[in-house]
């Protein structure tokens, strides 16, 4: 009987997502229509800074210019140990998508009031990816309705838990 060779598993999440930053305000301010995954063209010091989980998606958005998708206003601070090769923190970064996806996004943005908003940024198999959402902006009353719906749902779950425990 042949012995099976066992290899040591590498530490860390090799096949999974390692989240760098999330845009929590995006789901509050926008109703998400469709979600895409895009790669990001970065410089070396940007990747090093992202490995330390330094990034802010708060004011970031994406645009389609000349058949290319650009991520604007994403803040990646300068790498602490970088030298003169350090990057500019708020430069425009190219997003890597398939041509069909870019054409779909461009068509939907042109026909309706849609925005491209980054939801999260993460490492996937050593590559930086952005979860990009095709979204429509919410009005103040929409936000209030969502909050009321969420509170009501939370109260129902709380009450069911009390009844299950025999308290209510």
Curated annotation (Swiss-Prot):
GO terms for molecular function: RNA binding. Transmembrane segments: none annotated. GO terms for cellular component: cytosol. Keywords: Cytoplasm, RNA-binding. SUPFAM superfamilies: Small protein B (SmpB). It is found in: Cytoplasm. Its main location: cytoplasm. Residues 1-20 are annotated as: Disordered. The keyword Protein biosynthesis does not apply. The keyword RNA-binding applies. InterPro entries: SmpB, SsrA-bd_prot, SsrA-bd_prot_CS. One of its GO terms (biological process) is trans-translation. Required for rescue of stalled ribosomes mediated by trans-translation. Binds to transfer-messenger RNA (tmRNA), required for stable association of tmRNA with ribosomes. tmRNA and SmpB together mimic tRNA shape, replacing the anticodon stem-loop with SmpB. tmRNA is encoded by the ssrA gene; the 2 termini fold to resemble tRNA(Ala) and it encodes a 'tag peptide', a short internal open reading frame. During trans-translation Ala-aminoacylated tmRNA acts like a tRNA, entering the A-site of stalled ribosomes, displacing the stalled mRNA. Belongs to the SmpB family. NCBIfam families: PRK05422.1, smpB. This is SsrA-binding protein. The gene is smpB.
